């Protein structure tokens, strides 16, 4: 019975899919992760998802985008208490689904190949959902409970309206000539040997860090706010840090799960 319930949760978890992924934002994180998988973890991933591994393309992301199963367009939310600990909620929650999917990956010999593939895909998708601040719902922070629009002022073309859910992805997407592979390599060079330190601690430690940074942004950003362009540019390093930390954390999770 436990196995049936777990499979149901995993299948629900993989509902957030292509439209929820930024073309380069999440892809760059996954490409970065593939660069830091152990030989055993990489072999496991290739065995689960196919034989067409291409060093120049994010393998996991490529398989994810090319999958033909009908998925919903929903995005999974991360629910946190005021102290940034995980909130126990009924129904869908990104962290809950991620932890349960990881359990299947760790115990993959006990499950069918279908169950393991579903779990692996869920891990990838849910990690990308969690690091987007627009998906972080924090008790006591009302503006974190849903998407909203705000205005950026001070640009050459006058005020522009943006959605909070695309706030971080807009930094990478702004540089249209740079591929996701370029961004992953850029993060690799920038962080160097220090990169995996972004994955220090437990998964829940990482989630709390995401929550803390999200709370800081929500404290000053709200619906219909006029954000000066200079301030928006000040957030750019934070956006890149979130992408990089997601890639390194994803690699650490898979390396730990597949020993």
Language-model features, listed with the residues they occupy:
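Sec-dependent N-terminal signal peptides
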Residues: 4-14
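N-terminal, motif-rich segments that launch catalysis or mediate targeting to/interaction with membranes
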Residues: 19-126, 133-259
């Amino acid at each position: 019975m436990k196995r049936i319930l777990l499979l149901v949760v995993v299948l629900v978890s993989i509902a957030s899919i292509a439209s929820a992924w930024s073309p380069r934002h999440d892809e760059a994180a996954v490409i970065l992760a593939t660069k830091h998988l152990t030989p055993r973890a990489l072999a496991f991933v290739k065995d689960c998802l196919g034989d067409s591994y291409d060093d120049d393309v994010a393998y996991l992301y490529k398989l994810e985008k090319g999958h033909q199963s009908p998925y919903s367009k929903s995005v999974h939310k991360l629910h946190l208490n005021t102290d940034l600990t995980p909130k126990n909620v009924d129904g869908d929650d990104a962290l809950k689904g991620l932890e349960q999917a990881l359990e299947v990956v760790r115990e993959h010999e006990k499950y069918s190949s279908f169950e393991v593939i579903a779990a692996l895909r869920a891990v990838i998708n849910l990690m990308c959902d969690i690091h987007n601040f627009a998906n972080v719902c924090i008790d006591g922070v009302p503006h974190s409970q849903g998407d909203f629009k705000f205005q950026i002022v001070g640009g050459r073309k006058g005020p522009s309206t943006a959605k909070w859910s695309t706030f971080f992805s807009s930094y990478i997407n702004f540089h249209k000539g740079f591929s996701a592979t370029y961004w992953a390599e850029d993060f690799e060079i920038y962080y160097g040997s220090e990169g995996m330190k972004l994955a220090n601690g437990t998964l829940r430690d990482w989630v709390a860090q995401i929550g803390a940074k999200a709370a800081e942004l929500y404290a000053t950003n709200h619906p219909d706010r006029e954000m000066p362009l200079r301030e928006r540019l000040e957030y750019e390093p934070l956006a890149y840090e979130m992408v990089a930390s997601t890639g390194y954390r994803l690699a650490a999770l898979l390396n730990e799960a597949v020993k």
